[in-house]
Amino acid sequence: MDGAYGHVHNGSPMAVDGEESGAGTGTGAGADGLYPTSTDTAAHAVSLPRSVGDFAAVVRAVSAEAADALRSGAGPPAEAWPRVYRMFCDMFGRYAASPMPVFHSADPLRRAVGLYLVDLGAAPVETHAELSGRMLFCAYWCCLGHAFACSRPQMYERACARFFETRLGIGETPPADAERYWAALLNMAGAEPELFPRHAAAAAYLRARGRKLPLQLPSAHRTAKTVAVTGQSINF
């Protein structure tokens, strides 16, 4: 990245560390608070993952161009969104297809944001408000790549809250007693894991006979080999 951060980088304003070049003042961002993604700080830009660096620079450049159009009274540039969309789809396709050797807590949310952007399609955007929002979501997707280290979270807090209401593919919220359930399960696994299939078979048997309440768990210091059920027994 260039050393002169106060100059234009790839057509996008880059502020000196600690400053947002005109953010919220009308000199860098568009009027009415639109296009906050038209500027960035050098420190934040270099902290992004290298895999999204080029795309983030394009988002800044397109946002700055659109902000200029807004200030001059023109509509959004016709090719602005199609250009960003094509680049994002290519990048997101590689991201979605790549193996994840280490799970990151932001990955499910990042996939949800990515799928939302892909579903928008490549048609040109007609209003500045819509284009500004899409640029913000693109920047948010990039920043999820350095979640917990991002220095600009306040930019996303309201606009991106919608993504926390979506289904992220990580299951339902666990019940309040989930910790007690898993603690018992882990204790069983540590004692005799080979009994798991038999416990599951017993549970299925009991469920089929209409039993709703769980059996009493054996004490931590005793392993039960037989569970009595209405005069019968299930041997483990």
UniProtKB/Swiss-Prot annotation:
It holds the Pfam family Gene66. Residues 1-32 are annotated as: Disordered. Keywords: Host nucleus, Late protein, Metal-binding, Virion, Virion tegument, Zinc, Zinc-finger. GO terms for cellular component: host cell nuclear matrix; viral tegument. GO terms for molecular function: zinc ion binding. Phosphorylated. Induction: Expressed late in the infection cycle. It comes from the Viruses. Residues 21-31 have a biased composition (Gly residues). It is found in: Virion tegument; Host nucleus matrix. A zinc finger (unnamed) spans 138-150. InterPro entries: EHV_Unk. Belongs to the herpesviridae US10 family. This is Virion protein US10 homolog. It comes from Equine herpesvirus 1 (strain Kentucky A). The lineage of its organism: Viruses, Duplodnaviria, Heunggongvirae, Peploviricota, Herviviricetes. The gene is IR5.
